[in-house]
């Protein structure tokens, strides 16, 4: 057994023993979601595929979470959270180089909470501090391509290492959140501060009984790991989000504008399939991005009908040598239907279609039909 696998096994055993011992001294909860089904894609430039759903191919990824809290004094508390995302079709960890995809120590009170560790950015549907969830930006509650807003807005490829975050609390009223990450563990060891990928976000808004609105300001300093490549300009992204509960229909609108984006969403296909590695590496400027996403949900009894419509326009500002197209757009739409078998178990049926042109004509996620069906169980 390799040292890395042995260390993971020892760590897992230690955590199990620690959790059992800690249960008597603090409140420890184990929760998660198991989602599986079938997934079909028919890309415009490739063969269609029908298979058992894997990672990122169900509305929510299968995950296991363990959270413990202990009261300190007055209304102050301290706690921890660790979680692993699982590819259920293979039984493997989605982030195979991490025992836990997310891990944090937190301390707070009734008004504010601070966290330290490996934490998700605000502009996705991953807890603990998802502004998308707080403002109901994605009412489909699904991360499918052609549906989720995070596919075309600022989104970190993975949860952020070395992160510090805070968030005010409360279900109603104004809120404020902040996050800072100074790069991955490997970059921290091997590169100086000026060479590492660094991310910061600040978000604020209002959550009312019917109306919710707010903004996310994102800043990212791209890494510079090749000495002879030009230094890339920093990314600045702005989200404007609003949602309203019309009763029973709920609707949300998200607008995103980005300057010097170095990816669309979390995928690496800007470099791999759109502008090419040479132009990407030799560019100081990135994408200018504009996207609008509208989502809606209509719950009625055991049924929930949801839909999403997206339009995005992107212009490459960097090295254009050899490029046939330097700008492009995508329009996509989709729907997800849920049927509640019980309080914990739901069936889902989803479909989406995306059509990208010019710069966005090659990536399959912008040019395909997608269909999915399956079951999710929460515990």
Say what each PLM segment does.
Residues 1-25:
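Gram-negative bacterial Sec-dependent N-terminal signal peptides
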Residues 14, 65-67, 104-108, 165-167, ...:
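Outer-membrane beta-barrel architecture
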Residues 26-40, 53-182, 196, 205-212:
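Outer membrane beta-barrel
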Residues 28, 76-78, 111-114, 172-176, ...:
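Repeated loop/turn-to-beta-strand initiation elements of outer-membrane beta-barrel proteins
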Residues 32-38, 80-84, 116-118, 178-182, ...:
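Transmembrane beta-barrel strands of outer-membrane/channel proteins
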Residues 51-62, 98-101, 158-162, 196-200, ...:
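Residues that define the transmembrane beta-barrel architecture of outer-membrane proteins
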Residues 195-197, 201-332:
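Detector for outer-membrane/organellar transmembrane beta-barrel domains
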Residues 367-379:
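Outer-membrane beta-barrel "beta-signal"
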């Amino acid at each position: 057994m390799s040292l890395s696998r042995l260390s993971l096994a020892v760590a897992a055993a230690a955590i199990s023993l620690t959790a059992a011992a800690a249960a008597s001294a603090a409140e420890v909860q184990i929760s998660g979601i198991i989602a599986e089904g079938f997934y079909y894609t028919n890309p415009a430039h490739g063969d269609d595929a029908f298979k058992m759903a894997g990672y990122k191919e169900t509305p929510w990824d299968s995950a296991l979470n363990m959270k413990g809290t202990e009261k300190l004094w007055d209304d102050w508390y301290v706690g921890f959270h660790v979680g692993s995302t699982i590819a259920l079709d293979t039984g493997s960890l989605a982030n195979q180089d991490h025992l836990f995809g997310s891990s944090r120590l937190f301390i707070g009170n009734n008004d504010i909470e601070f966290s330290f560790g490996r934490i998700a950015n605000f502009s996705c549907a991953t807890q603990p501090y998802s502004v998308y969830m707080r403002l109901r930006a994605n009412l489909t509650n699904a991360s499918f391509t052609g549906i989720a807003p995070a596919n075309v807005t600022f989104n970190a490829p993975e949860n952020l290492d070395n992160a510090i975050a805070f968030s005010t609390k409360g279900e109603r009223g104004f809120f404020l959140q902040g996050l800072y990450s100074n790069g991955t563990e490997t970059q921290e060891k091997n590169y100086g501060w000026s060479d590492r990928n660094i991310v910061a976000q600040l978000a604020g808004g209002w959550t009312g009984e019917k109306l919710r609105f707010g903004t996310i300001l994102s800043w990212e300093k791209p890494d510079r790991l090749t000495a002879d490549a030009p230094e890339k300009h920093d990314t600045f992204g702005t989200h404007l989000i609003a949602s309203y509960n019309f009763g029973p229909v709920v609707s949300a609108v998200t607008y995103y504008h980005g300057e010097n984006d170095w990816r669309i969403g979390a995928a690496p296909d800007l470099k791999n399939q759109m502008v090419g590695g040479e132009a990407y590496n030799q560019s100081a400027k990135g994408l200018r991005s504009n996207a609008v996403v509208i989502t809606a949900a209509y719950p009625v009894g055991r049924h929930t009908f949801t839909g999403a419509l997206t339009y995005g326009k992107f212009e490459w500002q960097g090295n254009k040598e050899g490029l046939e197209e330097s700008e492009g757009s995508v329009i996509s739409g989709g729907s997800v239907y849920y049927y509640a078998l019980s309080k914990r178990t739901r069936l889902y049926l989803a479909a989406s279609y995306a059509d990208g042109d010019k710069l966005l004509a090659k990536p399959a996620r912008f040019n395909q039909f997608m269909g999915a069906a399956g079951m999710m169980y929460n515990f």
